[in-house]
Amino acid sequence: GFLAENADFASIVQAHGLVFIGPEPEHIRQMGDKVQAKITAAKAGLPLVPGSPGAVDTIEEAQKLAVDIGFPLLVKAASGGGGRGMKVANSAVELSEAFSSARSEAKAAFGDDKVYLERYLDNPRHIEVQVIADSHGNAVHLGERECSVQRRHQKLFEEAPSPAITQTQRKNIGQIAANATLEMGYLGVGTMEFLFQDDEFFFIEMNTRLQVEHPITEAITGIDLVREQICIAAGQSLPFKQENIQFEGHAIECRINAEHPETFAPTPGIVNFFHPSGGAGIRVDTVLYSGYRIPPYYDSLIAKLIVHGRDRQHALARLRLALQEFVIEPIPTTLE
């Protein structure tokens, strides 16, 4: 929810003598500001996309930095998320419009018009690493997730493990993420997001909460991330070490949104008939039922279909069958 990454809320919870199930407020605040997150990430040894050292206040400053960084450039909101406040500039002429547009969009969406610059990678993979740490000096990674299939910079399909990286790359980036988590003194579950292009990883942000796509990590590791974050908040140690974690099979998540399948326009309304998929290796997380009214507010995500197979081909076969079985009527959805 909206409070999961709200540092002020976490602080209020702690001030009232309660335990916030999640990271410390300082880490939520650091990683919520994308500029501060890059500074923290650099100190923790994470590889970064070439870009501005901090927030850029004027177009004149942006033009000067662009000479060193090179085009194409991405102008990004410091407090952004969900693909909002991001504009691509392919030249100095386009930069002026992108800079102004990104700031306006950021101000309207997040109440903060701070932006920064990054080199725009034209064909990257979006790969994220699940990390988890306790208050006893233990931090591990639970492998990576491939999240490259997106629309409007928002994910549609996720899978684990990624078919795009090697075992050596997987081990290296996982260890880098775990070491950075320990270096930061981070507590609880978190996700480090990277862009991967030309065999290089570049850190872009850290989500200080449980991700929508966490079930595919649970499927291939057998670890209940919800349970573990509650146990960590209760002061317990992680019940496993890095060497104990085994990855089994392949998992894919399909986000089912109340959106028109071609235009992605929202489609709120009443669900007259709902039939979720079932069977071996199939999991459905949803609030839907026959008669449920999909509201016109918030996110359009209404269900998550997760499949687990012995390998990628097996998982894809299960996904095809599960999608055929899944019925939501009469609302148009991305199932179609």
Over which residues does each language-model region extend?
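Glycine-rich active-site loop/lid that clamps phosphate-bearing ligands
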Residues: E243-Y298
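Acyl/amide activation-and-transfer machinery of modular secondary-metabolite enzymes
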Residues: R152-E159, P295-K304
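Active-site "cap" helix and flanking loop/linker of ATP-utilizing ligase/carboxylase catalytic domains
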Residues: E159, I165-D199, N207-P261, I331
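A short N-terminal helical cap/helix-turn-helix that marks the beginning
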Residues: I232, L321-E336
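Short, well-ordered beta-strand elements within core beta-sheets of diverse protein domains
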Residues: M86-V88, R119, I165, L301-R310, ...
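N-terminal beta-alpha lobe that positions the nucleotide/phosphoryl donor
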Residues: G1-M192, F196-Q211
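A short, well-structured catalytic beta-strand-centered motif of the EAL phosphodiesterase domain
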Residues: M206, L210, A303-V307, L319
